């Protein structure tokens, strides 16, 4: 996968070696030590910048799975959703990722589509992922991991409802492809 990432960077043109650091964990003896060293380099690079205030409307935050259990849908995920709604109310944007996490609760997001075009994009997004699973002989509705189940998640719907709570109550503004820049402020779903 790292080769693909490096190739993507090369296709996009040059990059700043001080700003972008990476390691291939299989190629290093002690990934914690190397990781710390890479972080030190990033911190040193960042120290050269001056902080300044910018409006919240320029902030984009990704909402990713943090490990679901029986309490995350009651505690952390609603809090993240409230943050998302607050940021969006200030003109900022959030991106809800991990489409398979949405399976089982996708209609909640469909019902919040900003318009018919966005609704169609959400339907296409969900169906494309389900078709991908089917083409590769994967079970669509068996997403909870053993760890999720041990933590109290009993069904895909339990897990999916937790996922959708991270998006708050804002309308879904758009669906974007991986690597695409947000065109519409607000809640975006990532392909």
Predicted regions and their residues:
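Active-site cavity-forming subdomains of large catalytic enzyme subunits
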Residues: 1-50
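Glycine/charged-rich beta-loop-alpha catalytic/anionic-binding loops adjacent to active sites
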Residues: 19-25, 65, 183-185
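Short amphipathic alpha-helices and their capping/turn segments at secondary-structure boundaries
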Residues: 46-52, 82-85
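Glycine-rich phosphate/diphosphate-binding loops that line cofactor/substrate pockets in enzymes
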Residues: 50-60
